[in-house]
């Protein structure tokens, strides 16, 4: 699968680079391919781009993990050959581009709720509780609503420190989309977006920034790509899905969420899928090219 993706990536990026050079009157060959965007798939892209360069010695891929919003702006400004985003372009963004943009779904993954609580390595949360925490309505770990779904855990009388993204983020877009689905109050007051005005918590840049703050801060809670939690060995909460089951973000539960038919333009969401084993905070991520 990885070899196939590397080959497809070569064709996609070479086509993109040749189109850009042709439109600018340049050479049709190019040794450096530049991209920028989402931090969520960055660990995966690191491996893929490494394999791509090993298989194609004449090419170098430079990728800046600056967030989905930055990747979209960079593609619009023609400062990169490809952008990367965890949120597909909306109609306004499509209309702002200089040419037709192709969405290539490269991988799927899960956004996890990582936390740091000494002595607690198992926790359950619901979308409604996460919404209340980030709205500032629940501010203690031993709040009765959290305790009610974690009856066998001795939750501390400790303030919750929610951590969120400071940059334009596709991870934030998917996180806020999920909360807008499960919480009317969130939908009415916060809505969906790559960048939001947060009422409580600590801001950090990129998935690595949020993961780092969570790792260093007792009582913290943050939304990050599952690979970042795995790398830092951060515990993550089981989330209640639409079917009422508490599930972890695993290959099986994310795949269950992705059991959907993709439209022709590849723009699809798998947030809060209704499968009994589906992980509710699952997503596709895309490479964007002209």
Name each model-derived stretch:
Residues 6-16:
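Bacterial N-terminal signal peptides
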């Amino acid at each position: 699968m990885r070899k196939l993706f590397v080959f497809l990536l070569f064709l996609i990026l070479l086509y993109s680079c040749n189109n850009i050079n042709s439109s600018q009157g340049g050479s049709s060959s190019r040794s450096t391919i530049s991209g920028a965007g989402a931090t969520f798939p960055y660990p995966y892209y690191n491996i893929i781009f490494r394999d791509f360069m090993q298989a194609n010695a004449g090419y170098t891929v430079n990728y800046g993990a600056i967030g989905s919003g930055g990747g979209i702006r960079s593609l619009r400004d023609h400062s990169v050959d490809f952008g990367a985003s965890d949120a597909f372009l909306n109609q306004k963004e499509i209309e702002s581009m200089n040419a037709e943009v192709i969405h290539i779904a490269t991988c799927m993954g899960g956004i996890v709720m990582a936390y740091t609580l000494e002595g607690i390595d198992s926790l359950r949360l619901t979308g409604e509780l996460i919404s209340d925490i980030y709205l500032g309505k629940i501010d203690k770990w031993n709040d009765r609503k959290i305790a009610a779904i974690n009856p066998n855990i001795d939750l501390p009388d400790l303030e919750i420190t929610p951590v969120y993204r400071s940059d334009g983020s596709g991870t934030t877009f998917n996180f806020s989309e999920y909360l807008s689905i499960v919480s009317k109050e969130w939908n009415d007051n916060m809505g969906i977006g790559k960048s939001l005005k947060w009422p409580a918590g600590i801001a950090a840049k990129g998935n690595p920034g949020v993961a780092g703050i969570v790792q260093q801060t007792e009582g913290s809670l943050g939304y990050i790509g599952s690979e970042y939690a795995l790398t830092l060995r951060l515990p993550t909460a089981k989330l209640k899905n639409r079917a009422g089951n508490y599930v972890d973000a695993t290959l099986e539960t994310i795949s269950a969420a992705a059991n959907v038919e993709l439209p022709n333009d590849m723009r699809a969401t798998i947030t809060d899928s209704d499968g009994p084993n589906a992980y509710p905070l699952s997503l596709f991520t895309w490479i964007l090219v002209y």
